[in-house]
Amino acid sequence: MAFQIPRGTQDVLPGDSEKWQYVEHIARSLCSRYGYQEIRTPIFEHTELFLRGVGDTTDIVQKEMYTFEDKGGRALTLRPEGTAPVVRAFVEHKLYGSPNQPLKLYYSGPMFRYERPEAGRFRQFVQFGVEALGSSDPAIDAEVMALAMHIYEALGLKRIRLVINSLGDLDSRRAHREALVRHFSNRIHELCPDCQTRLHTNPLRILDCKKDRDHELMATAPSILDYLNDESRAYFEKVKQYLTALGIPFVIDARLVRGLDYYNHTTFEIMSEAEGFGAAATLCGGGRYNGLVQEIGGPETPGIGFALSIERLLAALDAEGVELPVESGLDCYVVAVGERAKDEAVRLVYALRRSGLRVDQDYLGRKLKAQLKAADRLGASFVAIIGDEELERQEAAVKHMASGEQTNVPLGELAHFLHERIGKEE
């Protein structure tokens, strides 16, 4: 029986994995530059965490979670998103007592959602995200959005736009909720079955519906921006002011509500405008969640963050034709001709690697010509050939693969020679 990977998953093979490493390196480096530290949480949590943290009326909780019972009868769930686990760790380890407030964290790892697989979307996907906990300053909202944009721009994406909205505080959302119920109630039969249920549980979710997004009722639905109280309106104005001061262009979409229940005040998405990327062009989403820490059992603590899918980021790079400057190939391939030379090659390869070079050798007992072909396939910049004659002179015949230029180099000087030549090439 030939086994295949489960639907909605993928293997990342050599040649592609280097792109993943590069993208993750850029994201991590920028987070460090902005003062964010890494946090790592388990890939499964108690199911109740997501019921409370994500919201039991959300599509994620109702339709998409991978939930199971362990041998101890505990209900556990493979994490569908990263914010609730980070907040759980924040509360459990009493990080709210840290003098370094706000606490700025980033994470990266696999998430799991049972949804229909499509281009750039998987049932297991890698999410990179940040969370800033402990500040309700609108300047940190702008910082989080600036960091997200910086990651995409540093990777070479140009056809992206930042879309923002405000959901306001609790009073603003309550007034907007009542207006939505009045708006949709008389024509509820025109909505999809899910939205008919949402009208009574969480009417704001109707605005996030993919099935009814083009319905005339959506276009005429009450705007949350018309229901912001003075405090919420002033907060949103300050966020926009900071973004403008940073020179970050944005557009406002009053229907941007995001798919999780914990958001309030600022919400945002980064969209791809690349041709052929598809209708679902959201690359990144985030927002403020001032009540989530309390909901999970901690003290009242404001927070804001974002999450992006590495898979969708790579798809956007492909759509824009961006070539990542990933390292590939070897610095040197050591070719051994004869058993005595093989013994020396093993020692030499180890020494060259210890000096910081990318080096490999033959392990299949191939002839000289076959080893040279292998070096070429592996993208080696140089080949160091050792045979009986070279051993007698304690030298290697070093060939530059691109030019064909060949020179004899003492074995004790080979590492220095390669570092010098490769440094000049770079």
Swiss-Prot record:
Superkingdom, taxonomy of origin: Bacteria
Subunit relationships: Homodimer.
InterPro entries reported for this sequence: aa-tRNA-synth_II (IPR006195), aa-tRNA-synth_II/BPL/LPL (IPR045864), Anticodon-bd (IPR004154), Anticodon-bd_dom_sf (IPR036621), His-tRNA-ligase (IPR015807), HisRS-like_core (IPR041715), HisRS/HisZ (IPR004516), HisRS_anticodon (IPR033656)
Alphabetical UniProt keywords: Aminoacyl-tRNA synthetase, ATP-binding, Cytoplasm, Ligase, Nucleotide-binding, Protein biosynthesis
Catalytic activity from the UniProt record: tRNA(His) + L-histidine + ATP = L-histidyl-tRNA(His) + AMP + diphosphate + H(+)
UniProt KW Nucleus keyword: no
Pfam families noted in UniProt: HGTP_anticodon (PF03129), tRNA-synt_His (PF13393)
Enzyme class: ligase
GO biological process, one term: histidyl-tRNA aminoacylation
Protein name: Histidine--tRNA ligase
Taxonomic path: Bacteria, Bacillati, Bacillota, Bacilli, Bacillales
Gene3D superfamilies for this protein: Anticodon-binding domain, Bira Bifunctional Protein, Domain 2
Compartment(s): Cytoplasm
Entry's Gene Ontology molecular function annotations: ATP binding; catalytic activity, acting on a protein; histidine-tRNA ligase activity; transferase activity
HAMAP family: His_tRNA_synth
Catalytic activity, EC: 6.1.1.21
GO cellular-component term (any): cytoplasm
Organism (species): Geobacillus kaustophilus (strain HTA426)
Family of the protein in this entry: Belongs to the class-II aminoacyl-tRNA synthetase family.
